[in-house]
Structure formats: C-alpha cells, structure tokens
C-alpha cells in the first residue's frame, strides 16, 4: 500500500513537508499510522511511505518562511540549526528551490546534519518510521538525489530492516538516466531495489490509443528488460495512472482534450467516450496484471474515476458510485495473478506483436499463461504456438482446440484472452 506523503504540510498534496516527525492531523496521528501498519500486516499488506527528501516546504519548521514555528528556521538566518541545509544567493530572498518553485526550497543532501537527521542518526526519519511499522520507502524525485544519499538510505535499511524495500521515482530508463551531468548508479547494487516503471505506461498508452503499434510496446519493454537487473525488471512498479498523470480512463476515452484548464477541470466523458475508454482500460488492466513487475492500481482507477492532470486526477473516491463491472474485472485479474505463478514470476516471450494485436506469454516451470490483446476497432485473427491440445481462456471460460501445435483464434474488437493449459 503506497501512501503519498503523510507528514504535516501546508498543502493537501504534502510534497511541501513541514515536519517529518508529525503525521498531518488531517489524516490522524502516529498511533493511527501504527495501527494501520499492524492491521495491514495481519492481512498480508505492507505499507510504503513517500520520502520527499530533495526539498521541504517553505512553511516548515526547517525553513519557516512565515515564522509560524516558534523556533528559528533557515529563513531566520544562521541562528537556525537548519540554516546550512539550504543554499542562499544571497540570504534571505534568493535560494535554491526545486525547479525554481519558491515554496519548495531545495535542501543540500550532502550536508552532514541533514544526512544525520534523515538517514544515519539513531532516530533518523528513515529509521523512525520503519520502526513505526512502515515496510518500504519510495524516494520522490530519486534522480535528483545524490547517489551517495540513496546508498546511505539503503545501507541503513539493510542493516536494521533487511526486509524493507527502497523504491525510486524515475520517469525514464533508470539505467541510462543522466541527471545533473552524471550517469546515475542507483540500480547497480547497493542503491534502489527498484523503480516506478513509467516507461511501461509511456509505451502502453499510445499502443492502446492507436498512435503506435504493439511492436513498439514490445520493443520499449524489451529494452527495459535488457537494461535492468533481473530483480529490478521483475519487481518494477507497473501502473496505469499516478497522482502525477491524468487518469488513463480519461486519456483513452476523451476524443478531443480541452485546451482550457477550466474546461479540463469540469470535463466528464460522454457515454460513448466512456464506453470506449472503459473497454480500453480493461485491456490496459489485463496487460498490467499479466506483465512482469508488480501491478499497482492508483486508487479509483478500478472504480472508473476520471480526471485530467493534477489536481483533477486526485478527487475523492466515489463511494457508492463505483463502476461495479470494472471493479469485478480488476478483482478477477487480481485473483488470477495470485493463483498463477507464471503471471507472478514467469519469463516473458512475444509470439506476436504487430499493429493492434499484442500477444505475450509467461512461463514458470511447466505453467504457461498467454495474454492476447486486440486494441483495434476491427476483429483480428491470430495464429499462435500452443503445445497442449486445448487452451482455456481464464477470462471467459471458453476453450480452444489446438491443431498441429498452433491455435487459430479470432479476437473481437477491444477484446482479449488469457490462455492457460
């Protein structure tokens, strides 16, 4: 269960941390968090926290731009113990900030005091919240953190919490990433365990939208597979939407996105757009659950939530108004993923990837699962290798007879199969 930032902050998104030691009272308190982690673990669920360590909020106990906190912050000058966490040019009006956004002053991650506070101290932020029950950290803007900072977090986690997981937010291929003129090393061992797999979404969306072919998706994913260490590829955080992207249902359904921001704020798909978008979203979800990696669902996607960019993609969950058919689809995919070892850890091969048709097979030992997707508006006939005499579609319950080690199947428009032996 990946939570966006939970710590006290001035905004509702909380990427402008005000106090790393305090849960935002809008959400509850530390005891509530501990209870959540305890009850989640009883149900086989672990909690991952969002670590925003590249910058703080200007309205924070550390910077204290508005003087809200009684103790001096960096904005009050060298009297503050946090003054050297930030870089002023000159004090007090000009300072380094994340992408120049002044309410997000950037910290110096090489400052010894800051590293001790966040990572290495006996009661550091990393240690404190893992002791409180968290099982993982997701590092916000990981490619803007020094490699040494990431390695230090991993070392502390490995020492005190060897089962804890360290995930990084990187939007590109993490093995070829260059940031601030330096090739990043966080996937070479001793750094991040894995990454958010934005390349998966970046390749899947145009295939489903019809602006690229299945072969383009295959090629993009094979590049990632070739470049990534195997644990990072097979454990990548795959997703369809995040808090930083428009919801996939809206992107796939909307025929002509409004240019005006206010229009996007109030936009709702027409019945025809929603029907098409839902059909494509179901295909996307199937690929998500059948593909190597860890399928991750942004809250509400499974219920049919719509929304363009932030903040329109962050509305409240539609309690009592969910798309129940879509919910059932996601539940079915989750059950199949849990039941089939091939979908969890199997190797991948592509017997067919051309145009609107994407077929990939997962194999673990003697178990095979083959995902066949037609993202086109017309029927498609496919000819696939199949060793067993019969193929069973785990989605519809249909069975197909193989002839001479081949399956000859027609896929309806916007249709898919998950074939098992």
Enumerate the predicted regions with their spans:
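Hydrophobic faces of well-ordered beta-strands that scaffold small-molecule active sites
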Residues: 1-3, 47-49, 137, 166-168, ...
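The substrate-binding groove and active-site-proximal loops of carbohydrate-active enzymes
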Residues: 16-30, 102-117, 134-144, 205-212, ...
């Amino acid at each position: 269960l990946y939570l966006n930032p939970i710590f006290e902050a001035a905004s509702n998104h909380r990427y402008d941390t005000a106090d790393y030691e305090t849960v935002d009272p809008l959400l509850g308190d530390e005891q509530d968090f501990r209870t959540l982690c305890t009850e989640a673990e009883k149900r086989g669920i672990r909690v991952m926290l969002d670590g925003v360590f590249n910058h703080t909020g200007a309205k924070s106990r550390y910077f204290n731009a508005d003087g809200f906190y009684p103790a001096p912050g960096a904005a009050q000058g060298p009297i503050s113990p946090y003054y050297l966490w930030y870089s002023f040019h000159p004090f007090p009006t000009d300072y380094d900030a994340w992408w120049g956004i002044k309410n997000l002053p950037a910290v110096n991650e090489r400052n010894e005091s800051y590293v001790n506070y966040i990572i290495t101290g006996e009661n550091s932020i990393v240690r404190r919240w893992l002791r409180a029950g968290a099982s993982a950290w997701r590092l916000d803007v990981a490619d803007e953190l020094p490699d040494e900072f990431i390695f230090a977090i991993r070392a502390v986690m490995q020492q005190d919490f060897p089962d804890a997981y360290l995930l990084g937010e990187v939007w590109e291929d993490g093995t070829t990433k260059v940031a601030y003129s330096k090739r990043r090393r966080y996937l070479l061992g001793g750094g991040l365990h894995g990454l958010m797999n934005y390349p998966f979404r970046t390749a899947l969306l145009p295939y489903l939208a019809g602006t690229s072919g299945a072969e383009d998706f295959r090629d993009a994913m094979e590049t990632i597979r070739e470049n990534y260490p195997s644990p990072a590829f097979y454990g990548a955080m795959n997703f369809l939407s995040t808090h930083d992207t428009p919801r996939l249902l809206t992107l796939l359904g909307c025929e002509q996105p409004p240019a005006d921001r206010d229009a996007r704020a109030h936009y709702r798909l027409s019945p025809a757009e929603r029907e098409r978008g839902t059909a494509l979203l179901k295909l996307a979800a199937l690929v998500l659950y059948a593909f190597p990696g860890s399928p991750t669902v942004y809250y509400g996607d499974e219920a049919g939530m719509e929304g363009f960019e932030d903040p329109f993609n962050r509305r409240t969950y539609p309690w009592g108004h969910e798309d129940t058919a879509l919910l059932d689809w996601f539940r079915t995919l989750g059950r199949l993923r849990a039941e089939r070892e091939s979908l969890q850890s199997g190797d991948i091969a592509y017997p067919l990837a051309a145009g609107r048709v994407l077929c990939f097979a997962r194999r673990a030992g003697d178990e095979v699962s083959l995902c066949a997707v037609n993202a086109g508006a017309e029927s498609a006939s496919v000819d696939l290798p199949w060793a067993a005499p019969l193929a069973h579609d785990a989605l519809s319950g249909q069975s197909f007879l193989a002839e001479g080690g081949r399956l000859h199947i027609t896929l309806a428009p916007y249709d898919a199969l998950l074939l098992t032996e």
